[in-house]
Every structure is written in structure tokens, then in C-alpha cells.
Amino acid sequence: MNRSKKIVALLLTLMMVMMALAGCGNSAPADDNAAANEAGYPMTFDNYGHELTLDKMPEKVITAGPNCTELFIALGLQDKIIGNSCDNHAQAPLDEYKEAYDAIPELTFGYPTLEAVVSSGADFLYAIDWVFEGDFTIENLEANGVKVYSNSASTVDEIFQEIRDIGKIFGVEDRAEAFIASQEDRIDDAMAAVEGMDPVKVFCYDCDTGDGIYTAGGPNIETELIEMAGGDNLFKNLEKAWIGVSLENILEAQPDVIVIHDYDEPVAADKIAAIKADPILSQLQCVQDERFVILPLEDAFPGSRTADAVETLAKGFFPDAF
């Protein structure tokens, strides 16, 4: 009986060792699955009506739009970016982002193309929504294995939700919340400084269309930024985010201030010179009084510069309040 017990015990021991070894062999996938579950994957987002589902954290990101690139840098996610696009017309990254920004490879200078994004090996695209045209669609990109999150915010609440979503996707939710809190504090301070002031009538000068001026309409985040800074966008009732208006309409509206979007080319100084030389716009009292507020183009986009934009606008509208 003793010998039989020893044999049974030996067999049980061998079985336990084999099970342990088998467990070790499967430990990496188990750990991966556990990590994925802890991160909350799979995740589904309502991205402005587009249902985005992610089974795992993206590894290779393309950003289209300087605002999208800067937002990733602000959240410490620059190492995820394998290429960026749409630096045409952009001025420059903020000083605190410049080193990281300059280290990111440029996929395309202008709009990204379907071929360029797919051939890059990217698995995720964060792009300002006006790049989606022709065959460069969310459907075509996702059919080629590239998940897409569209940067389409038209309000401050919406851009903050985008920041929260990006934070959740890449496991940096605490950073996202801290960044939003910092932005909110700065906006609150700027709004407090101009509280009680009579709103100034504002016209946004983006670019000359040849037969008018391209400006910000109602569903444009800049309309809310202007309001936060103590202004009133004279063309907020127009139903498009960006729309051309005639010189006669601008003259009739009689703005108190003109906000000039500063591109790489033409720069703000060239636009101001053109306004002063124009036989219609030069009639405006604000032009004669040189009431111009220069806003970097990137500040007008939904991204990491919400507070920067409100501060710049508020100081331009009410310089004596600061």
C-alpha cells in the first residue's frame, strides 16, 4: 500500500508540474487580455453620429490638422504619432509643443490622401473634419483598417468631450481631465475680467474669396470663443461653420472689431493692408480706428488652444480690462 501511495503521489506531482508549465506558456496572452479588459476595451464612441468601435488601443496614429497634432502632444501622446498632415497655412506650434511637434514626420503638407494614410501603416486617424472629401472618407479609411475619430467640435463642450475621448482611448484620462481643468480655469479668469462689459460687434476675417470674405458662421467654435471673450459674432445666424459674405454685408453690419486669422501666407499684416486699401471696407469706423485683433489660425480651430483663443480675443476686445 505504501508503494502504491508513493506512485499516486508522484503522478499527482508530475501532473501539477505539467499544469503549472502549461500555465506559464499561456501567461502572456492572459496578461494581455487582462490589460485590455482593465483598459476598458472594446470601446465604442458616438463621434458626431459615426459609431467608432475600438477593440484595442491604437498604436500608429496619423493626425490631420495642427490642432489635432498639438492636442496629442498636450496629452503626452506624441510617441503614438507616425505622421501628421495639414500644416499648410499654419503659423507654428506653441513654444511648449515645438520640440515634440518638429520631431513628428510629415505625412503630407496639405490634405492627407487615402493612399498616403493607408500605406503609412496607421491604424488610427484623428483629423479635422474638412479633410474628408472625394475618396478620403471615413468609410474608405475604415474599410482599409484605419479607425477614424473626426475632429468636428463646434462648441467648447464638444472639444472637451473629444479630449476626454482621446484620453480614454489612449489610457491617459487623468491627463485629459487635468488639461481640461486648466483650460476651464483660464477661460473663467478671462471671462471674469470682461464681465459686465457691453459686447463688442465682431467680424472674423479668414480669407478673401475674390468676391467676398470667408468668415465664421453659427456652427463654428469661434462663435462661442468670441462670446466667452465678451464679443458677438455678427454672422452667427448663418448656418454654415465657414461661409463667404459680401463686402456690402460687412459694411452694413458695422463691426466694432475685426478678428484677423493669421496664416503663414498671407500673414495678418497683409490682410490688414488689403482691408485698408479696399474702397468698401476702408469705410468702416473700426478700420479707420485700427480695431484689429490678430488670432493665430490654429487658435480658431477646436483643439488644445481654447483658452489661448479666449484670452487673446478678450484682451483685444477690452485691452483696458487686463
PLM feature segments, named:
Residues 6-7, 12, 23-70, 173-205, ...:
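Bacterial Sec-exported substrate-binding components of ABC uptake systems
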